[in-house]
Amino acid sequence: MTDWLDILKQQTAAGDQMSKTVTDMLADPAITEDQVKTLFDALEQQAEFVEKLRVALEKFDHDFPVIRAAERLEERYGDLAAGVAEKLKALRS
């Protein structure tokens, strides 16, 4: 049986690390458009995975705080992707 709570914990830890990594990368003045695009694509994939995780948690009737934690993680990846998209837009200007 899949341990959805363990997966959520792992993904939350990965999200914490990703937040720091994204911030550091976007602050680097030498970052290239290709690097930003790759970063955006990775964040989009991660957001899609977390969305599927949230749906699974809902399907298996986990408590609201667990589902809410997955929603917050999904929002975090969305916010990170939006920040990266802004950087990509700025680099293309």
Where do the protein language model's features map onto the residues?
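Amphipathic, soluble alpha-helical interaction motifs
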Residues: 21-25, 52-56, 83, 87-90
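Intrinsic disorder/low-complexity signature
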Residues: 3, 13, 38, 60, ...
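Amphipathic alpha-helical binding modules
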Residues: 66-93
